[in-house]
Amino acid sequence: MKSKITLFIFLFFLICVKIYSQTTMELDQLIGIHNTNLVGDTIKLEVNTYNAFKKMERAAKNDGINLKIVSAYRGFDRQEIIWNKKYDKFTNEFLMEPKKAILEIIRFSTIPGTSRHHWGTDIDIIDGNYPDEKDVLKFEKFEKNGVFYKLKKWLDKNSEKFGFYLA
């Protein structure tokens, strides 16, 4: 692994499925090197997570919310690219000391090999009824008067019914 590590600058709205936490994983799967238990076309999820999401998606649609996954499974290599990109930005563009840059990055992102996205159980979602914008996962977009506030309130009330927990 490279000595530098970078993360996404925008915030993650992570959701994790409890059901998968009871499953045993191989080390390669745990750290994002290899995962064969994934389903989906362009967006990959662990099979139980996928099925739970589909149920939640149907329920949300009945309430006028169009759940759209903007990030799901990503392997070690993709996480490393993200980490390195953020690290470069913080140290080269913002001129942060390496330790300070890392501390800033880990506020919202994880070091490659430690991301729950490696498991295919975490998803970042938005309400697809609203046009995509830059940095869709910023906290303020999920707060009162934010474009995804209705989604946040719906998830607060309903996500655990489907085995998802906001993080």
Tell where the protein language model's regions lie, with residue ranges.
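Bacterial Sec-dependent N-terminal signal peptides
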Residues: 1-26
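Extracytoplasmic cell-surface/polysaccharide-interacting catalytic and binding patches
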Residues: 18-167
